């Protein structure tokens, strides 16, 4: 093997190229690779964190939805109870009002009945007095008394 100046020049040039590459080219390449690796790792971590946060958000949303449904059901139940209470109150008020009206009507009927009885008593008294006057004005005759009383009975009946 023949070592000549060309081979020696090539070796020196190669060594200078390796040194230059190691000194000036290789560190920025390694730095770029490290930065890229770091960015990829950060991206994966961010994706994992985002996935975890999304799962937490879904859980929170599910819990909030369940709570909202429970609250809505409770509101509906309370509204139903209130409506039933209002219906019951209305029924009770209507029953009380009906009983009051019925009591007033009975009272009015009783008053009218008493008035009618009183009027009938007055008329019977007047007829009895009239009959007694007629009996006393006439002579005492049993046959006439019977006729007068029969006539009085017809007037009453």
Swiss-Prot record:
Q: Does the keyword Ion transport apply?
A: yes
Asked if the keyword Zinc-finger belongs to this entry, the reply reads no
Question: What topology in the membrane does the UniProt record assign?
Answer: Single-pass membrane protein
Task: Give compartment(s).
Answer: Cell inner membrane
MF terms in GO: proton-transporting ATP synthase activity, rotational mechanism; proton-transporting ATPase activity, rotational mechanism
InterPro entries per UniProt: ATP_synth_B-like_membr_sf, ATP_synth_b/b'su_bac/chlpt, ATP_synth_F0_bsu_bac, ATP_synthase_B_chain
Name any GO cellular component annotation: proton-transporting ATP synthase complex
Transmembrane stretches, start-end: 7-29
| Entry-linked Pfam families | ATP-synt_B
What domain of life?
A: Bacteria
Keywords of this entry: ATP synthesis, Cell inner membrane, Cell membrane, CF(0), Hydrogen ion transport, Ion transport, Membrane, Transmembrane, Transmembrane helix, Transport
Family of the protein in this entry: Belongs to the ATPase B chain family.
Spell out the subunit comment: F-type ATPases have 2 components, F(1) - the catalytic core - and F(0) - the membrane proton channel. F(1) has five subunits: alpha(3), beta(3), gamma(1), delta(1), epsilon(1). F(0) has three main subunits: a(1), b(2) and c(10-14). The alpha and beta chains form an alternating ring which encloses part of the gamma chain. F(1) is attached to F(0) by a central stalk formed by the gamma and epsilon chains, while a peripheral stalk is formed by the delta and b chains.
Functional description taken from the UniProt entry: F(1)F(0) ATP synthase produces ATP from ADP in the presence of a proton or sodium gradient. F-type ATPases consist of two structural domains, F(1) containing the extramembraneous catalytic core and F(0) containing the membrane proton channel, linked together by a central stalk and a peripheral stalk. During catalysis, ATP synthesis in the catalytic domain of F(1) is coupled via a rotary mechanism of the central stalk subunits to proton translocation. Component of the F(0) channel, it forms part of the peripheral stalk, linking F(1) to F(0).
Instruction: Give the protein's recorded name.
Output: ATP synthase subunit b 1
